[in-house]
């Protein structure tokens, strides 16, 4: 059995203030406004693109986006923030939370079975049927490398079985104030796993409370032994290896219906921010958008 992974940068080294608000309107909107008044203000601001008092303009290619200051709750930028979209493997953050909530032994061996094979999209996996790995390793691979069979095995082995695990995911979403979020599986391969940028921001902030999710989702790589052979896995978000980025939590996602998605909590010039990018097309668009957000915030913070 492999030991629990230890990473050079302790993910718990950063303090955070969680402000999971009931909603995420721009700070330019007055508190207590009716939905109709808020919609009118948003129309005047443009096509559901709202920016804070930051003076420079940001343009992202992603279909929907939300950038939030964690400490203050300020919405720094939003685009189509209320649009309900498929979330692909961003789902795995919720899978991880309910698995950890269940407090099952993390060193317990879990077996990959025929039931974990992806017959919907026929995605490839190096975790062959019969592979046995500690629950901790499966959780790491699901978060770091977006390993679908790992996520499937985790939720299938949830107390009470698969249906109980998916029900727990939906209950957790409701408890976090995410009424527009729905889960039908634990991998994100199901096209009807949906959410909004605002609700994914809440999910990222909730996931940050779990040290294992912080550590595993930002691990650059990890090696496991599968049937006597070493298999090396890498993080699906290459930014975690970039020294100019200080990323506290990360998850990527992709299916055709969702496009390419990316959620992160990061420190930019010592400001903790949640970055949600949904429905990016092109292999590098979400990474380009994330770098544009970082550059924009650095300029804006320096000019304050």
Pin down the residues of each PLM region.
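Active-site-adjacent loops and short helices of periplasmic peptidoglycan-processing enzymes
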Residues: 31-198, 202-211, 268-269
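Domain-terminus/edge residues, biased toward the C-terminal soluble/receptor-binding domains
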Residues: 178-182, 188-304
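N-terminal secretory targeting signals
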Residues: 1-64, 295, 299-304
């Amino acid at each position: 059995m492999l030991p629990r992974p230890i990473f050079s940068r302790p993910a718990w080294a950063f303090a955070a203030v969680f402000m999971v608000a009931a909603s995420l309107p721009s700070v330019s909107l007055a508190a207590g406004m009716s939905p109709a008044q808020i919609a009118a203000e948003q129309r005047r601001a443009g096509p559901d693109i709202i920016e804070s008092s930051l003076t420079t303009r940001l343009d992202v290619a992603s279909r929907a986006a939300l950038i939030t200051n964690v400490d203050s709750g300020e919405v720094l930028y939003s685009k189509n923030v209320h649009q309900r979209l498929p979330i692909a493997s961003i789902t795995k953050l919720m899978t991880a939370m309910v698995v950890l909530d269940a407090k099952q032994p993390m060193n317990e061996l879990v077996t990959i079975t025929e039931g974990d094979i992806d017959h919907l999209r026929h995605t490839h996996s190096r975790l062959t049927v019969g592979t046995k790995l500690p629950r901790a390793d499966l959780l790491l691979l699901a978060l770091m490398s977006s390993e679908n069979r790992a996520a499937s095995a985790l939720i299938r082995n949830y107390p009470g079985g698969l249906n109980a695990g998916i029900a727990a995911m939906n209950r957790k979403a409701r408890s976090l104030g995410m009424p527009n979020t729905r889960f039908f599986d634990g991998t994100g391969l199901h096209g009807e796993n949906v959410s909004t940028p605002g609700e994914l921001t809440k999910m990222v902030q909730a996931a940050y409370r779990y040290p294992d999710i912080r550590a595993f989702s930002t691990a650059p790589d990890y090696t496991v032994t599968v049937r006597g052979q070493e298999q090396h896995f890498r993080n699906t978000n290459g930014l975690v290896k970039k020294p100019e980025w200080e990323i506290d939590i990360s998850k990527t996602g992709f299916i055709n219906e969702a496009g390419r998605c990316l959620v992160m909590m990061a420190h930019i010039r010592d400001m903790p921010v949640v970055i949600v990018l949904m429905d990016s097309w092109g292999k590098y668009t979400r990474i380009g958008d994330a770098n544009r957000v970082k550059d924009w915030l650095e300029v804006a913070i320096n000019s304050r």
